[in-house]
């Protein structure tokens, strides 16, 4: 992530996306901690605490930007999938263990109502206090406050659901262009250039081609490994659909669910979109790259490590080449020209 240009640009100029993306990383981290627990054997706090923090950070991400809701869908899929695995495992033992698994799962679901519904709603309502502080006289009771919050949600939803809005923007970029850096977004450039000044600057929002294109290959590898280790079978003597796996490695499904939860909702957004909307998907792309290089087979381990080192060096080289465009650094025209040839980014001559 440190070598990605979009990450540098978005965080350096402190766009709102920086905060929900950070919270999304934390909420998925704590959901991962929950998935790594066997709540039938371990103490209750081992499962409840990760869920509490995951829900807390989900509330913070939604309060920052609605992309946190997309993450919530991914968390729900991961949670119920893990619960299903536990129940399936218990069903192979005896009736008492199955009843215990169902009872504990139900208790966790009740806790999740607090962690993933009530707490996020409270955080979201409280986040409007600074905004409504300027509406003197319009809010005289908690009921008025809630009505104004609902009114704000309706206004935002109507804005985002207006077909074609913003599609005439010169840097409009549909969702399928983001992974291939189809149209970087222009942010700023130097307009007043003193006489004799030979350096230039410009700021664009775009990704490191090595990381973004490498991430697509890594996602394809994760999908292949996920499909390779799964087979679906209905056992006639059981009421459960058994999802069997030749491996207990759930990293691939975790990455794919997280990525698709952040990326696929943008397919349904009818208004104009831009490349920075891909920002929340980047942590899962980078995780996919790391997982793809993590090989346990000693026969291939050295080769993958060498390839990982070469990949990191290539990413660093491209980051240095494109660095001036990512942060607006004043540099010579020759340096900027390299970025201009690689991507559709430019500067005022």
Per-region residue spans from a language model:
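Short acidic/glycine- and proline-prone juxtamembrane loop motifs at membrane-interface regions
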Residues: 6-19, 64-67
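Membrane-interface alpha helices of multi-pass inner-membrane proteins
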Residues: 46-65, 263
